[in-house]
Design a protein with these regions (language model features):
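Active-site C-terminal subdomain of aminotransferase-like
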Residues: 1-67, 71-76, 80-106
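PLP-dependent enzyme catalytic core of the Aspartate aminotransferase-like
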Residues: 74-76, 102-152
């Protein structure tokens, strides 16, 4: 490893604990807000009481990442889904879940069935996957709230 890479790695590791705590706190606050939203059928966040796996999480963990999902009550068609996902200010559509930025993606039940045909699909709406980054949590909630207004 060259000196620059070692320096950047060392610098990043010094703040890792603070960043992970912030991911946990912010993602839990967003999950709690989503759990109360009338357009949300279910929130899948391990630190959220009532979520599948919460007892396991409570027994074995003290924090969580910023990655979780929720299910919309409505199954969005392709046009509605594109309108929903394409107009966020703070959330980007991407698969790079390990960074500091907030991300959003969607999966329809039929897409998941193609990947995991042996499992049962436990929802009829639209599954939205989130990674909650280090942006202000109230700004993230406001951005999600504006997204719900686009769902007719």
């Amino acid at each position: 490893v060259d000196a620059d890479t070692a320096y950047i790695t060392s610098r990043g590791l010094r703040t890792l604990g603070v960043r992970l705590r912030q991911h946990h706190e912010s993602s839990l606050k967003v999950a709690e807000w989503l759990a109360e939203h009338p357009q949300v059928a279910r929130v899948n966040h391990p630190a959220l009481p009532g979520s599948k796996g919460h007892e396991f999480w409570k027994r074995d963990f003290t924090g969580s990442s910023g990655l979780f999902s929720f299910v919309l009550k409505k199954k969005l068609n392709d046009e509605e889904l594109a309108n929903y996902l394409d107009n966020f200010s703070l959330f980007s559509m991407a698969y790079s879940w390990g960074g500091y930025e907030s991300l959003i993606l969607a999966n329809q039940p039929e897409h998941i069935a193609a990947i995991r045909p042996q499992g049962e699909i436990d929802f009829s709406g639209t599954l939205i996957r989130l990674h909650i980054g280090l942006e202000d949590v109230n700004d993230l909630i406001a951005d999600l709230d504006a997204g719900f207004a686009r769902i007719v």
